[in-house]
Amino acid sequence: MVQCKPPQEFSFGPRALKDALISCDLALKQMYTSAFSPSERLFLSEAYNPNRTLFSTLLIHSAYDWLLSRPEAPEDFETFHASLQLRKQSLARKHIYLQPIDLSEGLAGCPLLDHLRSCAEAFFLGLRVKCLPSVAAASINCCSRPSRDTDGLQLHTDGILSFLKNNKPGDALCVLGLTLADLYPHDAWTFTFGRFLPGHEVGVCSFARFSGEFLQAGSSVPDSALLEAAAAGGPETLPRERGRTLCFSALGMVQCCKVTCHELCHLLGLGSCRWLRCLLQGALSLDEVLRRPLDLCPICLRKLHHLLGFRLLERYKRLHAWTRVMVEIWSGQEAGEPSVSEDTLPFSADSGMGCESDTEPVTSPSEPVTPDGWSHPFPDGPEPVSEDGLGSLMASEVSLTLGGPVDAMEEYGQWLTACIQTLEREGAEEELLQVDAAVDALSRWEMFTGQLPVTKQHVPCGKDNVGLRRVLGDKFSSLRRRLSSRRFAKASSSHCRWGAEN
C-alpha cells in the first residue's frame, strides 16, 4: 500500500464545519440554541474551532484510504434532519436488541456480551440494550462457504439479515446480530465486518477478525464433504464447529465495542462521517479500523443527541465510568496473564475484499454499493449495505503493532475527563462568542455537492456591445433561415417520393 509520510490533513475549514454542525437554516439554528446550554455549545464548537484540542482533523495515510476511494458529499446535520422525514422508525421504542449467533457468555474467554451491552448503554444513553438468546447458525437459512484464509466457514450476510428481519421483536428500535464467524456479502468479497438492511433497522457484524492469533479450534478442519455441501448453500448441511473459541485481547475487545456502536449508529439513521476523526468513518484496511476513535465527532454527536435527547455531560460521565471498569478488568488480566497478548493484531493476507471481476477495484464497505459495481439482489427489500469490509487491493501482509491497549483505554478515559471539564466550565458563553466571531470573519468555503450550477439565462451586456449583438443576431437569423429552407426542401422531396410510390 502506498503510504503518505507523513499523513496529510484533510479538512473542510472552520466555516464549512460550523455550517455542518449548526446549519444555515434558521429553524435548525434556533433548534440548536434551544437544545444545548452555553457550555454544551462551547464543547460542540470544537468541531469548527481552529484551535480545537478535543477533536482531531482527518488524516490521509495512504492513497487507498476510504475517504479518497469513496468521495461523496458528507452528511451534515441539515441533510440528516431531512432524511428523518423519510424514515418510519419509531423512537418511542427504547430497546436495542443484540442477537448472538453461535455466541454465548464465556465462549470467548470473557463476558463479551456483558461488555458490549454496558458499552452500548453508555454510548446510546437513554436506550436499554437487551441480549436475545443465542441462536445456532445452522438453524438460520444462511448460505456459507469455506473461508479463504482460515480453516472455518464464512456465513453469507443476506440469510442472517432475513432471519433478523422476520424475527424482530415488536418493541425493538433495532436488532444487531453478533457472531464470531466470518461474514461475506458477495462472492467477490473476501469478508466484511458487518452489513445492515436499510429501512428495517436490522444488521449483523462479525468479531472474527479481532481475535488476532488467538483463534483456537478443537476441530479446526471439518470434513471436506461437509464443507463442499455447505458452500453449495444448504443450511441443513452447515457443520457445527465444536470446541471453537475466540480469545480476545484488550485491543480486540475495544474493536468489538467500536464495531458494535458503529453499526448501531447506522441502524439509528446516522450516515458515514467525513468531517473529523469519528467512529462513523468507513474503512478499507485494517489499520483504518484500528485508527478509528471510540466516540463521535461533534457533528455526529448532535445527530445522536437529536434522536435520543440525552445530556452531553451525563453521557460522557457514563462512558468514563465504563472506561474505568474496563481498565480495571484488563489491567488485572494482563498482570495475571502476560502471555495472552503482545498487542499485535495481524492483517489478513488479502486485507479484505478480493476483487475477481472487472468492476470498480475498490469499493466502500460503509456506503451503499453502486448498481454497476457490487450490486447484489436481495429479496423483498432494499439492498443491504456493507459495513467495513476491507477493500484495499494493494495491501500486503503486514502486522500492526500498537502500544498497550490498556494504556490506550486510559488515554481515552483522560480524553473523557477533558470533555467533562469543558462541559462543566463556567463563563462558556463569552468564550463561545469569541470563537464564533473569529470563525464568522473567515471567508466562506463553498462545497461541491456533485451538481453543477444552473446556467444563467440572461447575461447583462454593456451598451458598448450593441454592434456586436446586432452582428451576431443577423448571423443567427441567417443560419435559422437556411436551416428552415433546408428542412422545407427535404419535406417536399419526401412528399413527392411518397406520392410516386402510391
UniProtKB/Swiss-Prot annotation:
Domain of life per record: Eukaryota
Name of encoding gene: Amz1
The record's free-text note on cofactor binding: Binds 2 Zn(2+) ions per subunit. One is catalytic, whereas the other seems to have a structural role.
GO MF terms held by the record: metal ion binding; metallopeptidase activity
Entry protein name: Archaemetzincin-1
Taxonomic lineage from the root: Eukaryota, Metazoa, Chordata, Craniata, Vertebrata
Residues involved in Zn(2+) 1 binding: 262, 266
Coiled-coil blocks: none
PANTHER family per UniProt: ARCHAEMETZINCIN-1, ARCHAEMETZINCIN-2-RELATED
Region of interest called Disordered, as start-end residue ranges on this chain: 336-383
Task performed by this protein: Probable zinc metalloprotease.
Gene Ontology biological process: proteolysis
Enzyme Commission identifier(s): 3.4.-.-
Keywords carried by this UniProt record: Hydrolase, Metal-binding, Metalloprotease, Protease, Zinc
Active site annotation, chain numbering: 263
Annotated residues for binding of Zn(2+) 2: 273, 278, 297, 300
Family assignment from sequence similarity: Belongs to the peptidase M54 family.
Cofactor: Zn(2+)
Top-tier EC class: hydrolase
